[in-house]
A protein has these predicted regions:
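Conserved SAM/SAH cofactor-binding pocket of Class I
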Residues: 58-142, 152
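Conserved beta-strand segments of alpha/beta enzyme cores
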Residues: 95, 119-121, 164, 185-189
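Conserved beta-strand signature within the Rossmann-like core of class I S-adenosyl-L-methionine
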Residues: 162-172
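Active-site capping/gating segments
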Residues: 170-210
Length: 210
């Protein structure tokens, strides 16, 4: 079972050490324990936590393998931000900033990631309150946070400084892209979701207001 999981992780994220794999397994265990007390994710997804959330998050490393500064907006239970932070332990110096306004979820992230010595900072604040406080990242991530036009508004201050965004989106992503074009200009690359399903990962760069 563990060997299969390790192989699946390397298939989506590239070469990963056994120590990093063990860190992700430990995070999964903490996630399940905390989920019994606070709502970190939909209960229906817990049986498939490794595939549906951890591997789905880890695949972003393959798209931006050289990035060392990441910013995860609306981190929730830690996907993809916490997974990226654990993977970044192999790539020092690195830092992942996770922004989560829900205090209970932020406490989970702070506690679990500190125990794993992940190179990250958890910001228990609203995204808008972090402008000017978080150094410009190379990559911005967000998963199940908001429609594209809203995400662009939230990410604009960092993207103006040169960051690109990797955004998980579902089957209706084309409608969101079209709706965004009324107010925003941007470069777009579509990446297949290697974990399955009919979603995509959108790579956005050169974001600008029209």
């Amino acid at each position: 079972m563990m060997a299969e999981r390790f192989s699946a992780l390397q298939a989506v994220a590239g070469p990963v050490s056994r120590e990093t794999f063990d860190g992700l397994v430990a995070f999964e265990g903490e996630f399940r324990k905390w989920s019994a007390r606070i709502n970190l994710t939909a209960p229906s997804t817990l049986p498939h936590l490794w595939e549906r959330h951890i591997l789905d998050s880890a695949q972003l490393i393959r798209i931006a393998p050289a990035a060392r500064r990441w910013l995860d907006l609306g981190s929730g239970g830690g996907f993809p931000g916490a997974v990226i932070a654990i993977l970044m332990k192999e790539h020092a110096p690195a830092q992942v900033d996770l922004v989560e306004s829900n205090r209970k979820k932020a406490a989970f992230l702070q506690t679990s990631l500190a125990s794993l010595k992940a190179p990250c900072v958890v910001h228990p604040q609203r995204i808008e309150d972090c402008y000017g406080k978080i150094p410009p990242p190379e990559v911005i991530t967000a998963r199940a946070l908001a429609p594209l036009p809203v995400l662009f508004g939230l990410a604009e201050p960092w993207m103006k400084a040169g960051a690109r965004a990797l955004l998980h989106k579902g089957r209706d992503y084309r409608r969101e892209v079209e709706e965004s074009c009324d107010a925003w200009g941007f470069n777009l690359l579509e990446h297949n979701n290697e974990v399955g399903g009919d979603g995509v990962i959108l790579e956005i760069s050169d974001l600008r207001r029209l």
